[in-house]
């Protein structure tokens, strides 16, 4: 437990979702490569005998062995806007020999397949995971895909994970971890943290993901941020309805200790004879030179005043303009999908192409977002430096919502996101003011910024300013505003990110671009953005009178200008 993680392979592919063999000597895992697509591999723990198991390209997920390692199950996933749609027909749960031969589909839907204790059935979960349906179910089929049974149903759960001996089930419900006996009474059982007919116990005061069981079924494991947790379970399943303890002790956490260096380029670069827009007011240097040493600007000024070091690689930029990188603090950069990361993230390239060098995404899938962040910072992905909030602290219905009824609830919600490295959280439509105030208090204690969803509710927006939120995301829906609002905002420290392409209380600014320009012909946009994304939004135009725009995002912009003139910090947010 105190060791240092060591990579087992030398593949250039991205690797994910490892599963130990029952003898503990090898690991199954999936890979993704943007050019050759996905596969399933097997490798010994010493890194030897690497073997590709699948023969057909595809998007493969969560492989698992049976008890004697002679069979495997896995999921073939449908396509998506990041990984594409090639080789994604006949998706579902598959059974195959351990060497990948004789694959057959046993279910058209479901995910997270595993074998039953006697290897005669295959369990799988339906309803998705985060951002899936409100109700998840644990089902099973026989090895021919017949005799479908539904064992558990759980509203607002995220994961349902039976132990290998099928005596227990661990589950995640609204980010919290629980364990219960695996009751088999021939019918579907409703399962949640308030189940009374049999014992359901909490595994931890904190949140967790990647829930799984030890090979001997004596421990439940999970991760949170950079820690790996274990908790012992008492085997009392001779009577699953007995109200005896299931959990033996407090969870034990260890640091994973996987450390990657931030990517810092080597050498010097000189951009010569370039027009430079500086950050000194309105200053523009018409014939300038910029010298970059590794990842920092070393010199900047008029070309005639700068001596270029002999070791610098010189780029002559006559006719070009260099400007400071754009910081987009409300940038949705493709971190919503619950799946494997691509090696070239097109949303990153598209943002870079239009000058965005720093992005902050205020609504994401936590694991996806911080994976992208760390891959970018370590040099495995090209993209803007990225920050994010993790899951929004959602006040409405959803399997990812944050129930906040007291200060401890707020601390729990923020701590689970901060564990991944979040420096901000998004309070999203928490309906009551005291809920938002509890989030603010917890955020102050934990040193995290709070950027709330505006929600097109003027009075909530004003209370957010009174209560000291870091900034308001999206525009306030009332325009123009007068001295009372201007004075309040001026005397606060709350910023404003109006995201003008989405305009509450009027026509969205995005639509004006489609009406007045041929967006689908923009070469820079099309170089990095999939054609279907551009065409579906831009080719079928909505034509509206000009006054709709003037009374929409233009009027909002006039209020933004008035606030900026009063000293309110206005942020760029492209949404």
Region locations from a protein language model:
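Histidine-rich, glycine-flanked metal-binding segment
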Residues: 282-323
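Divalent metal-dependent hydrolysis catalytic cores, especially in the metallo-beta-lactamase
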Residues: 347-367, 383-394, 418-430, 440, ...
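Conserved blade-ending motifs and adjacent loop-strand segments that build the rim/top face
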Residues: 152-157, 195-212
């Amino acid at each position: 437990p105190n060791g240092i993680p060591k990579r087992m392979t030398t593949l250039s592919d991205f690797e994910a979702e490892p599963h130990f063999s029952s003898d503990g000597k090898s690991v199954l895992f999936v890979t993704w490569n943007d050019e050759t697509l996905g596969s399933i591999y097997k490798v010994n723990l010493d890194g030897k005998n690497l073997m590709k198991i699948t023969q057909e390209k595809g998007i493969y997920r969560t492989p698992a062995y049976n008890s004697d390692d002679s069979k495997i199950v896995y999921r073939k996933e449908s396509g998506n806007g990041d990984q594409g749609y090639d080789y994604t027909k006949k998706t579902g749960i598959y059974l195959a020999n351990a060497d990948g031969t004789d694959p057959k589909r046993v279910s058209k839907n479901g995910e997270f397949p595993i074998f039953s204790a006697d290897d005669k059935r295959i369990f799988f979960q339906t309803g998705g995971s985060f951002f899936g349906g409100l109700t998840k179910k644990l089902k099973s089929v026989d090895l021919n895909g017949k005799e479908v049974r539904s064992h558990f149903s759980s509203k607002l759960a995220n994961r349902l994970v039976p132990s290998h001996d099928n005596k227990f089930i661990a589950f995640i419900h609204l980010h919290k971890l629980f364990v219960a006996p695996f009751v088999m009474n021939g019918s579907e059982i409703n399962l949640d943290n308030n189940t009374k007919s049999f014992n359901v116990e909490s595994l931890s005061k904190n949140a967790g993901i990647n829930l799984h069981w030890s090979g001997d079924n004596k421990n439940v494991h999970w991760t949170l941020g950079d820690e790996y947790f274990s908790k012992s379970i008492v085997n009392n399943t001779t009577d699953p309805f007995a109200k005896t303890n299931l959990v033996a002790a407090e969870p034990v956490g260890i640091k994973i200790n996987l450390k990657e260096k931030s990517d810092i380029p080597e050498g010097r670069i000189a951009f010569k004879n370039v027009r430079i827009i500086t950050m000194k007011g309105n200053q523009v240097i018409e014939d300038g030179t910029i010298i970059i040493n590794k990842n920092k600007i070393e010199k900047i000024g008029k070309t005639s005043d700068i001596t270029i070091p002999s070791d610098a690689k010189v780029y002559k930029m006559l006719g070009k303009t260099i400007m400071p990188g754009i910081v987009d603090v409300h940038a949705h950069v493709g971190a919503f999908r619950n799946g494997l990361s691509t090696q070239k993230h097109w949303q990153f390239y598209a943002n870079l192409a239009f000058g965005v060098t720093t992005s902050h995404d205020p609504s994401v899938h936590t694991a996806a977002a911080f994976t992208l962040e760390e891959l970018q910072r370590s040099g495995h992905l090209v993209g803007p430096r990225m920050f994010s909030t993790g899951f929004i602290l959602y006040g409405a219905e959803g399997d990812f919502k944050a129930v906040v009824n007291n200060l401890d609830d707020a601390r729990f919600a923020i701590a689970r996101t901060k564990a991944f490295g979040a420096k901000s959280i998004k309070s999203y439509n928490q309906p009551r003011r005291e809920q938002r105030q509890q989030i603010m208090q917890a955020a102050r204690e934990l040193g995290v910024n709070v950027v709330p969803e505006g929600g097109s509710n003027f009075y909530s927006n004003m209370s957010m300013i009174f209560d000291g939120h870091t900034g308001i995301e999206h525009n306030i829906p009332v325009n123009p505003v007068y001295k009372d609002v201007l004075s309040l905002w001026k005397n606060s420290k709350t910023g404003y990110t109006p995201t003008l392409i989405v305009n509450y209380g009027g026509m969205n600014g995005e639509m004006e671009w489609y009406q007045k320009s041929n967006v689908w012909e923009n070469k820079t946009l099309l170089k990095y953005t999939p054609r279907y994304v551009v065409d579906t939004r831009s080719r079928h135009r909505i034509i509206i009178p000009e006054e709709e725009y003037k009374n929409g995002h233009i009027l909002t912009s006039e209020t933004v200008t008035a606030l900026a003139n009063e000293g309110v910090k206005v942020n760029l947010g492209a949404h």
